[in-house]
Amino acid sequence: MADENGGIFMPKKYNTIIIGGGTAGLTAAIYTARQNKSVAVFENGIFGGQIADSPRIENYPGFCEISGDEFSDRLLKQALKLGAELIKKRAAAIKLEGKDKYVISADGEKTQCDKIIIAVGTRPRPLYLENERELLGRGISYCAVCDGAFFKSKTVAAVGGGSSALQSAKLLAELCKKVYVIHRRNEFRGEQRLCEELKSFHNIEFLLNSEIKKINGKTRLESVLVKNNLSGEETVLQLDGLFVAIGKEPQNEIFAEVTELDENGYIKADESCKTSTDGIYAAADCRTKAFRQLTTAAADGTVAALSP
């Protein structure tokens, strides 16, 4: 490879490159660095991952309670202390040349390694309704922790039935005048303790067996059309904010050429985190697995780093 002066140089080579700087990625970096192996972590967003947005973590062993921001910060500092290198770039592709592996960043730079661990996590699943994308950031959000404060003393809705949706609803209820909690089923899938906590808020109204069918607004969110799936009744809710927390979906499109994906877009990997391609591993939420929790993300990061 020639440099700008016509000379020849080799791209920097690491033992391991990790794509994704969340819990799994940073755990893998910690374990790789502790083996005295060179390791770099590619992350275009926030090092620490989506858990940094969680106001409170209560289900990670050893911590009765810790904020997501503090948890992520501790992981990051530990990885750095052990010698992991952080590369604030988006990994755009993986290129295989014989036994050589390269991660290509969005700016076209190639970084060589012997082993790749994919730990990109997932992205919020949208409602897939007209106007949703256009009004994102204009009343629609996928992160109550990030954006909830903008809606203080206003009327909002939280959509979803898992723990993330319930946590969002609780945070919003502490800030907002009125919070509608919209869920398509009759019961919530989230932690029962959270459900009981929400019932104590006088400003929360539950709309169960209900779905949003239409989003209204030109330059900002104005209202949503909600349909009760049992009665068929439709109601228009005037809203200042809509917080969507209906789960996650994979973001593995760029890896489809070098790893096998399942029918839902998750990377096929066994319990050693090995993919269909030698030397490429997939850890945590981006891979096929039964459970996607903070603890299983850390476990996958460990396994992927230690697997030969």
Where are these regions (language model features)?
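A Rossmann-like FAD-binding core segment of flavoenzymes
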Residues: 6, 79-105, 110-111, 173-271
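Glycine-rich, N-terminal phosphate-binding loop of Rossmann-like dinucleotide-binding domains
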Residues: 21, 120-121, 246-247
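Glycine/small-residue-rich loop that forms an oxyanion/phosphate-binding "nest" at active or ligand-binding sites
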Residues: 86-150, 161
